[in-house]
Amino acid sequence: MSQTATLILTHGQIHTLDRANPLAEAVAIADGKIVATGSHDRIMSFAAEGTQIVDLKGHTVIPGLNDSHLHLIRGGLNYNLELRWEGVPSLADALRMLKDQADRTPSPQWVRVVGGWSEFQFAERRMPTLEELNDAAPDTPVFVLHLYDRALLNRAALKAVGYTKETPDPVGGEIVRDSRGNPTGMLIAKPNAMILYATLAKGPKLPLDLQVNSTRQFMRELNRLGLTSAIDAGGGFQNYPEDYEIIEQLHAKDQMTVRIAYNLFTQRPKQELEDFERWTDMLKPGQGTDFYRANGAGEMLVFSAADFEDFLQPRPDLPQGMEDELERVVRHLVEHRWPFRLHATYDESISRMLDVFEKVNRDIPFNGLHWFFDHAETITERNIERVKALGGGIAVQHRMAFQGEYFVDRYGKEAVKHTPPVAKMLELDVPVGLGTDATRVASYNPWTALYWLVSGRTVGGMAMYDDDNRLPRDVALELWTAGSAWFSSEQGKKGRLSAGQLADLVVLSKDYFSVAEEEIKGIESVLTVVDGKVVYAAGHFSPLAPPPIPVLPEWSPVVKVPGHYRSAPPAAAKIGAMVQMHQCCGSCGVHGHQHDIARRSSIPVSDEQAFWGVLGCSCFAF
């Protein structure tokens, strides 16, 4: 007798990523697992009284997306405090959003824009000025983080953090000052971003009960974008077990809607080995459940190995003592069979790290232990081969989609063509998983990352890659699903819609496999299923949606700006995509003025009369 399904989805285009059965019309689910995929008639044989049957009406279905490098646990604690500029088409819009939020934000709270945007996404192609931040929010502290390189603080924020003429510059950072020595509000990473993160940490925090709400809101936003799993990369100011209280509470109450495998990130420079000795006594890799489980160490193993990825600054040279410190930690991890990950941007750093790994491997064989580099933008073919020889992998994120213009400015157009060399990694048969590295710099939107991989373009539209380093859509998707599963040692358990695998899937708003490249960025989920249960539904599927979770506190930016900017309805999407390709060049078909003149103007965007052009009329939106 066949197993009875609790949920059947039918009449769809189901891309299973199962090579034995790649395309199906229907899928049957029971007990949180895939029972079978196939034709409507075959799958309906698993139906019985009480089976929920959903008509997909031809929608495309894919396995749930899995971000192999996301700072979800930390990001969730702060999500309700942050105004998102991801995908916002103009600086004028961004500043208007900021002003509206400043007007709603009670003292002593801040308005924070923390990552996910680039000035090149804006029609104006520039960052806000400090004057514009002060005009938008004269009394409310404002903190705007730009990539890994700088933060902009208005006068109220400078007062809140206490930076004055007497405040010294921290090591690796600069407080920009005026001619009298007073801080202007600009903080620069040179190249250490600690000045940025330490300043952000001075802001008010949500109480624990609201951190619960914030984390649930963040997971629901990720579900809206089709994410069902993530590998949490730890982070600064995220100590274990103290800062895991909220996520463990949600796990205990069955309120998680994104599966998390978590890595532990050392918090104490020069005491890293002590951190990992304590944690290896507390946890075993894989300990937990399919929703929340320990994954190993990293992405920070020792602070001396951190090669900061600020392409506005020269490549940093790691200190001479790095190898000895890294060897002690890696030796301990391998002895305890703890998987590990390590942040590494530059090939020069990777070469030295691999020297350490090879030395340890000669004494204590890695022997199938899962380990991997994160990022690896400039890794060479020779070092990819060394990674493979040690059984390692490479987790790649879309940081170049946000920093590509700066990389070209420093290293040139030829150098960027294989930064990172994803196609070469695949050619050499090294495990590759994809992700975002959100939330402090890049966007958490997986479709921005898929667009980058497929098109080879930045969020500002700059073409970086030739065809030989762009990925076919099916390959890019597989790396976002089954590919990422390797990095939490869950290959064969998730990432494909095949019998016995976890029932995590996404019904898409558009057909990823056929829409124009520019439309990939606007894809989202209309139905997300995790563990066989609906965790998000929209549009035609809205009646299936779980109950809404009210956003708290009531002044939270998420109330008015619920996450990533949403693109125009399908009828207008083609026009919007065209504008992004052409960067607002040419004349307005309605008024006849020249958009490109306005785009390149340095006139403040608040001066609407002088700035008549792209932003002086409604045509800029099209």
Regions found by a protein language model. Name each.
Residues S2-H11, H15, R19-T280, N295-S349, ...:
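Divalent metal-binding segments
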Residues V114, L145, Q397, V506-S509, ...:
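Residue-level recognition of conserved beta-strand edge/terminus positions
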Residues L17, G116, G235, A376-E377, ...:
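Flexible loop residues that form catalytic
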Residues L250-D254, T280-Y292, I364-F366, V387-G391:
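Acidic (Asp/Glu)-rich catalytic clusters
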Residues A485-F487, K493, V507-I520, V526-G613:
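C-terminal functional module detector
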Residues G76-N80, P170, Q255, T289, ...:
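Short, solvent-exposed loop/turn segments at the edges of secondary structure
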